[in-house]
């Protein structure tokens, strides 16, 4: 470790110094840089070390856990010179005013004792989710299901506005991880499994959060922290914070792509993957942190660790012998701020490492510059706190946006015999553990880390309450109930199944609301992707009645239901639609609104067949000729991009501007979409490409564009896409981007057209 990981950073610097410097990802601002240098030259070593450390607010709490202890604040800021604080008091959301008052107290003391403003950070994930009076939107996985970037923009704008209103200038959002393993407990925090979808949605959210000028972030915007850089979402075991093994070409082509898009959009900070890639902990990976981002992108932003992950380098990963060695490893690899929640002596250790020469003064100053630059760009030196009136806080407009986003995100997966929509006079029986739970509708990062919406937001409707408000005859019996202890999300009480089945006998239709209770991060790890045995037993019991069952899936990841899906007449996946999700579902089931969501992930059918839509062509093979029974057929419950509507759409006239192209060309693609049904409807039009022959085994297809349109019955609209030829390139075995001569198939809505690349091009730059 000592002979390899630490010298790697120096090696990268040497290479970078000899290579042409790329244009900066964020253009430098002379006034910003002058301010940074003027502050830096006056700082002591201890002050510099303190700027690199971020502590949890719990270290400042008094015995009530609801207020700051002035003596503790004096020590943390006066003795340790700490530059950043994060999180919420008592591990629970507070009001905007309570949060603002707390941060004002910290800032006043920071300016008094250090002369440098503190920067406060919070995990705001799907809105102002750590404010009791804030606006919540559907989780990222739902926004991905809309295939409508406007909702990522709306959520980002509202989140920034309300967070800044609480004096918080930095959010740990958006989540950039690709949700490509359905076992992973954080899949719901992503926009889905596809890199292009993730990149488009995350870029919209980033720009909405930060605004258009990253050097001057206004008082209605906040700094983002792209997380978790990178490859975090595909742990080999499916368990959170465990190792990933990713080929380098896939790492750059798929996992880096969304980050690249957002770095180029001006993202000011990024949080690092808590685990490891190919045996190297990401927090010690100089190639990725310093090489791929700081050097190859000429990015002057800040890398912050995730929770206590410097400690994990020695406690868990065993690549360092102790805390000091771990600090040196991380900082020399490119970490600029250490989220060390409970240990202020981290500051002292950094001072010692600099004095011992194990962290160079140049690396220290570089990290401090990045921290100061962030604070200058946020205007914190001019206004550590601010008195702006936020008159649009929690405006009804934000609630309407959230409702609309939920409507467009909930996915109709099955509608046998057109059982949906339901007439309001139908006798409806509602059951299942998710029927009457706001906690389940919201998921994690909702008022509390593990989710606790019922405690904080009783004014919103659960699924049951929304159905009772919309339909005339609704009865309810849960059948299965969750243990509401925060860390016991998998525990269920199934003693009420027989009672629920008996109560359903008089109904015309049964709505069974199943799925998961809320969880977040490692506590969400599990050993079986199947929907729980108790919930399946409930559905099987209900099926004996011969009544039509509408299965509502309220879950953060696609739990396997292949054995009970045939028992259901309709299936709706609402995922985690948040506070307005119950009302959205009622509007959809009644026909007041139309379904238009599509799955942003592949819904697997079998436990040993967890595929993504862009699998390799060699993974799907029919039986080979002869005696060798080669069975490798893709069989999923529902594919990526699947979703039904109450109307129907026909695609025609798929055309491309040229049947032959070169590397510098832009292909113009058009397709006609017609609403052939009797209802107004929205349709997400998805464009794919397939490379038919390549020097590496190609993916069967890749998403290259999408657009959401609304059509009246009988209306036809021509959807246009511009597809740069470079978008069809892939990363070869040598790590270089390449577009190879040969045939490609472009497809959309079941139609296909062939085009030919007439030349091969290999790029020498790492990013195109």
Could you tell me what each predicted segment is?
Residues 753-759:
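Edge beta-strands of extracellular beta-sandwich domains
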